[in-house]
């Protein structure tokens, strides 16, 4: 099967960071803390802060793509252009707790297998990895443009 990869630089950087983890206890992973600083959230004091959006913002910004700048995952629903059929590397936004909640999760689309979607993201079990989510949790897919 052939795949089209959107945002190749972003996806590649995400894969380069695969396995990056929060540090236990009082320590903070300096790379995760850099995600926050790079997008102007210098006030964040620890890697225990939800960082899925900071991760996507960071890899988008440093690779020259538009980015939300916000730490709320659902901010990505207003960034980029909505697409109905995603390519590898497109942004995927999911709901968390409930569809009507303000809470969410954001990552990069890898693929769909049956009624599940594989997502490359940060803060997935406290690390950068590929995790599986029910397709029913997807709020939308976004393609970003170079800036």
Name the predicted role of every residue range.
Residues 1, 61, 85-86, 143-147:
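Short intrinsically disordered terminal tails
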Residues 1-63:
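N-terminal capping segments
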Residues 3-8, 65-129:
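...with weaker cross-activation on analogous glycine-rich loops/strands in unrelated enzymes
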Residues 11, 117, 139:
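A broad, low-specificity signal marking well-ordered, structured residues that form hydrophobic/aromatic
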Residues 28-30, 72, 134:
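Helix N-terminus capping/helix-initiation residues
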Residues 45-46, 128-130:
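A generic structural signal for short coil/turn motifs at secondary-structure boundaries
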Residues 131-147:
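Intrinsically disordered, low-complexity, charged/polar segments
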């Amino acid at each position: 099967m052939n795949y089209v990869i959107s945002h190749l630089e972003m996806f590649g950087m995400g894969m380069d960071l695969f396995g990056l983890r929060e540090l236990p206890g009082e320590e903070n992973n300096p790379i995760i803390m850099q995600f926050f600083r790079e997008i102007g959230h210098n006030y964040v004091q620890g890697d225990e802060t939800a960082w899925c959006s900071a991760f996507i913002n960071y890899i988008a910004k440093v690779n020259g793509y538009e980015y939300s700048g916000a730490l709320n995952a659902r901010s990505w629903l207003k960034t980029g252009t909505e697409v109905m059929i995603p390519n590898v590397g497109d942004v995927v936004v999911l709901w968390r707790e409930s569809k009507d909640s303000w809470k969410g999760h954001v990552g990069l689309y890898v693929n769909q297998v049956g009624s599940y979607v594989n997502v490359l993201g940060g803060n997935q079990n406290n690390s950068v990895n590929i995790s599986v989510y029910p397709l029913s949790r997807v709020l939308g897919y976004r393609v970003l443009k170079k800036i």
